Amino acid sequence: MPDKVGYWLDLCDEDMATAKWLLRGKRLLHMAFYCHQIAEKSLKAVIAQKTGEAPPKIHDLIKLAAKSDVYGRLSEERLSFLEELGPFDIEARYPDYKAKIEETLTVEKCERILEETEGFMHWIKIRLGR
């Protein structure tokens, strides 16, 4: 049986490397999108471990956290952070929203987002025993 949890975590590691590369190149909107992806895939790893099945094909981080066993364990700061990441997924793909979102991003803000994303991913890996 394939390691479904490992599959999602491997994707997280690949996306983290990409997010760091994008930040170095000051591709801030794309970096923020990848941070959303990392959080999403981290939560999907938890769901895969919990259910033994493929996670739902949704992108809402709060809904994914609720379907996992981590929602009740999220600090207010982490919950707020997941909410902050929300707009970087779907909205970042549409031209009408891209410019508005891009205006809110600075290198300093993106450095913080990347750091918090890495911390969240690490926290999930610890919870999963990885």
What are these regions (language model features)?
Residues 1-130:
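Terminal alpha-helical segments
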